[in-house]
Regions:
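Signal peptide processing junction and immediate N-terminal pro/mature segment
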Residues: 1-9
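Gly/Pro-rich cap/lid or specificity-loop segments adjacent to the active site
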Residues: 10-270, 336, 340-624
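Alpha/beta-hydrolase-fold enzymes
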Residues: 222-332, 336-337
Length: 624
C-alpha cells in the first residue's frame, strides 16, 4: 500500500501529495514516488499527469545534505531513471554528503510516457507518422514542452522540500537545465551542461551539425597516424563516397550491431544517417575512411556493416518507457525553430522550406546536398513538417530573462556532431560565470560513463568546490583509433614491428597485427551491441560478458579473410586496459599470442608476445 506525504508545491491552489513507491535497489532512506501535476497549469483543477522521481540518500545522515544533485536526461524522450546506474556511478564519489535526485520529465520513463501507435515500429515515412502521432495526441501535445517540464521539476523540489541543487543536464537535459536556470536561478547552487546547445534551438536546417561533421572528419583523421585519407582532405574522401551512392546506391546484406543479417540500401539519405551517428558511435569516425576506400575498390562489406549498425530499418520500436519518440516530437515541434513560420499552413510549408534552403551559401551542407541533409527520414530537420503549429506560445524560458551568475561548467566533446562545440561556445558566452571545457576526441556527453577519467573528474571537482580545477586532461584524451585499411588478405596488412628477441617472419607479424585488429574491432562493436554476441566482419563470432571487467570470447573471428582468431580478451572499462590470449590460424601458420594495450593513452602501443609455428614472436605496433 502506498503512503501519501503532504508537501508544499509552488503556485498550486492545494498542496499536492507524493505517492510513494518502492525504490529500485534503494536504501532505507531513499524516497521514490510520483507527484501529480496539472497537464495545463492554467487549469490547476483539470487533467493531471504523474511525474516520477527517485531521491537517493547521502551516506552521512547525521547532518543535513551539503546539497542535492539533480540529474536530467536528454533526448528529448529518454528516461532519466532508466539510466540510473550511470548517474549513480557519477554521483557516488559525492554521495557522502550529497543526495541525488532523478526525475523523469513529463511524457518520459515512468512519468506517463507518450506512446503513439505510429511509432511502435521503425518504418519509413517518418514525417507522415509524425503527423499521425500529432493527431493521436490531440491538443494535449501542446503541453509536453520544456517550459512545463522545468516547472514540474520545481514542483518536485518543492514537494520534497529540497534546497538549492547542483543541476546536471546532458544533451537535451542541458537544454532543459538552461531553461530551469533562467526560470529558477534561486534554486541553483551550480549548473553543469554536458553536450549542450543554445536556447531556443540551433540552426533549423542543422547546418551547424554539417559543419561539425566536417570538422570531426578532419580531427579524427588528422590526429591518427596512418589515416587512410592520406594527404587528401578527409571530407573529400567522404564526398567521393556521397557522389557514388547518390548515383548508384550500394545494396547488400551485412550484420548489424548484434550480428543479425540486415538488408541495407546505402543511398545519400542513409549515408547522412551514418554520419549523424558519429555523435554516439565512434565506429563512424573509426571506419568511414577505410570503408570508403574499400568500397571504391569493390569491397563494400565494411561500409554495409557500418550502415547496418547505424541506419534505422523496419522493425519493432523500443519500449517507450526507455525512449519516447512521441515525446521527442512533441517537444521539438513546440520548442525548436523551424524552416517555416509558425503561421504557415502545412500545405505551404514545403515551398517555404525550399526558399529557406536556397538562401544558404553553397557548400553549407557539404559533403551532402541540402535536400539529403535536411530530408533524412529519421529525426531530421523536417520531422515537424506536418505537425500542427502549437495553439499556445510557451517558450522554454521567460522572454527577456537574464542569464544568472550561477557557477556553470560546460563540457563538450570536439567530435560531438549533434550538439557541436560551436553551440556550447555560444552558451558559455551567455552565462557570466561559466567555464567551457573542450574534451578532445570525445563525442556526445562526456562525464557519464567516462572512459578516460577526465570529464567526470572535472565534474566532481566542480560540484565539490564550484571550480573546475585542473582541466588539462581534456587535451590528452586518446585519439580515435582510425582503421588504416580493411585488408583482403594478411599479406596486405602492415606487420607489427619486430622486437629484440623476435625470430618471426614478416608474415607472422602481419598475422599478429591482424589478430590485434580483430580484437579491437569487436571491442568497438560493444558500443552498438545489446545482446552480448556478435559476428566478425569476414566470419566467425564473438561474445562478451561482465560489467567493468568484460571478457570477450572469440570463435574463429575473422577480420581479414583467411585469418581466424580464437581465444579471449579482457577489457577493464574504467582503466582502458586490454589483455588478450589468442590462438590464430592463417593458412599453414598457427600462432599462440599474448597482447596488451591501453584504450586510455594517446598514441598507445600494443605489445605482442608468443610463438608462430614455434618461432618466438616479440613485436609491437600502434595500438588498434
Amino acid at each position: 500500500m502506498s503512503a501519501q506525504v503532504p508537501a508544499q508545491a509552488p503556485n498550486a491552489s492545494a498542496a499536492p501529495a507524493i505517492v510513494r513507491t518502492a525504490c529500485p535497489g534503494g536504501g532505507a532512506h531513499d524516497t521514490c514516488g510520483f507527484l501529480r501535476v496539472p497537464l495545463d497549469r492554467r487549469l490547476p483543477d483539470g487533467r493531471k499527469i504523474r511525474i516520477y522521481f527517485e531521491l537517493r540518500s547521502r551516506a552521512d545522515r547525521s547532518r543535513p545534505p551539503a546539497s542535492t544533485v539533480l540529474s536530467v536526461e536528454g533526448g528529448p524522450g529518454f528516461s532519466t531513471t532508466a539510466d540510473r546506474s550511470a548517474r549513480i556511478q557519477l554521483w557516488r564519489p559525492l554521495s557522502a554528503r550529497r543526495d541525488l535526485l532523478l526525475v523523469d520529465l513529463r511524457g518520459t520513463g515512468r512519468s506517463d510516457p507518450l506512446d503513439c501507435t505510429a511509432f511502435r515500429r521503425h518504418i519509413l515515412g517518418y514525417i507522415d507518422r509524425a503527423a499521425r502521432c500529432a493527431a493521436e495526441l490531440g491538443t494535449a501535445r501542446d503541453f509536453y514542452d520544456t517550459s512545463q517540464s522545468v516547472q514540474d521539476l520545481a514542483a518536485v523540489l518543492g514537494a520534497l522540500r529540497v534546497g538549492r541543487v547542483d543541476l546536471y543536464g546532458d544533451s537535451y537535459g542541458s537544454y532543459a537545465a538552461q531553461a530551469f536556470a533562467l526560470r529558477y536561478p534561486h534554486k541553483l547552487r551550480s549548473l553543469v551542461l554536458d553536450g549542450t546547445y543554445q536556447l531556443p534551438g540551433s540552426d533549423p536546417a542543422l547546418a551547424d551539425l554539417a559543419a561539425s561533421t566536417r570538422s570531426g572528419l578532419r580531427l579524427a583523421c588528422g590526429r591518427r597516424p596512418g589515416c587512410p585519407a592520406g594527404r587528401e582532405d578527409p571530407v573529400k574522401v567522404v564526398a567521393g563516397l556521397v557522389a557514388r551512392v547518390r548515383r548508384d546506391p550500394i545494396v547488400g546484406t551485412a550484420p548489424d550491431g548484434d550480428g543479425t543479417p540486415t538488408h541495407v540500401r546505402l543511398d545519400e539519405d542513409a549515408l547522412v544517417q551514418v554520419m549523424m551517428s558519429g555523435f554516439y558511435d565512434q565506429a563512424v569516425w573509426r571506419d568511414i575512411f577505410a570503408a570508403a576506400r574499400s568500397a571504391k575498390a569493390g569491397d563494400t562489406r565494411p561500409l554495409l556493416r557500418l550502415a547496418a549498425e547505424t541506419v534505422t530499418t523496419d522493425g519493432p520500436n523500443g519500449d517507450p518507457r526507455l525512449y519516447s519518440e512521441s515525446l521527442y516530437l512533441a517537444v521539438i515541434c513546440h520548442d525548436y525553430p523551424e524552416l517555416w513560420s509558425p503561421s504557415t499552413p502545412v500545405a505551404q510549408r514545403p515551398a517555404e522550406v525550399r526558399a529557406a534552403l536556397a538562401a544558404y551559401p553553397a557548400g553549407t551542407f557539404a559533403p551532402f546536398s541540402a535536400a539529403a541533409w535536411t530530408g533524412t527520414d529519421f529525426e531530421g530537420a523536417l520531422a515537424c513538417l506536418r505537425w500542427p503549429s502549437p495553439a499556445r506560445t510557451d517558450p522554454p524560458a521567460p522572454p527577456g530573462a537574464a542569464y544568472p551568475r550561477v557557477p556553470t561548467l560546460i563540457l563538450n566533446g570536439d567530435l560531438d556532431n549533434i550538439t557541436p562545440l560551436a553551440d556550447a561556445t555560444v552558451v558559455a558566452h551567455r552565462f557570466p560565470r561559466s567555464t567551457l571545457v573542450d574534451v578532445e576526441n570525445s563525442g556526445h556527453v562526456t562525464a557519464l560513463l567516462d572512459q578516460n577519467d577526465c570529464a567526470s573528474v572535472i565534474y566532481l571537482h566542480f560540484v565539490s568546490t564550484l571550480s573546475p580545477g585542473d582541466t588539462s586532461c581534456a587535451s590528452r584524451t586518446p585519439e580515435v583509433r582510425v582503421v588504416p585499411a580493411f585488408a583482403r588478405s594478411a599479406a596486405a596488412v602492415p606487420p607489427a614491428r619486430a622486437g629484440r628477441r623476435d625470430r618471426s617472419t614478416i608474415l607472422d607479424r602481419r598475422v599478429a597485427s591482424t589478430a590485434a585488429q580483430t580484437v579491437a574491432d569487436a571491442l568497438q562493436r560493444w558500443w552498438v551491441n545489446y545482446d552480448g554476441t556478435g559476428v566478425g566482419l569476414r566470419g566467425g563470432r564473438w561474445s562478451y560478458s561482465g560489467g567493468n571487467l568484460m571478457t570477450f570470447v572469440f570463435h574463429r573471428d575473422s577480420f581479414v579473410p583467411g585469418v581466424a582468431v580464437s581465444g579471449t580478451a579482457r577489457w577493464v572499462y574504467t582503466t582502458g586496459r586490454v589483455r588478450a590470449n589468442l590462438v590464430v590460424r592463417a593458412g599453414g601458420v598457427l600462432e599462440h599470442l599474448r597482447m596488451r594495450w591501453s584504450l586510455q593513452v594517446r598514441a598507445a602501443m600494443a605489445d605482442i608476445d608468443g610463438h608462430a609455428d614455434g618461432r618466438p614472436l616479440h613485436a609491437h605496433m600502434l595500438a588498434p
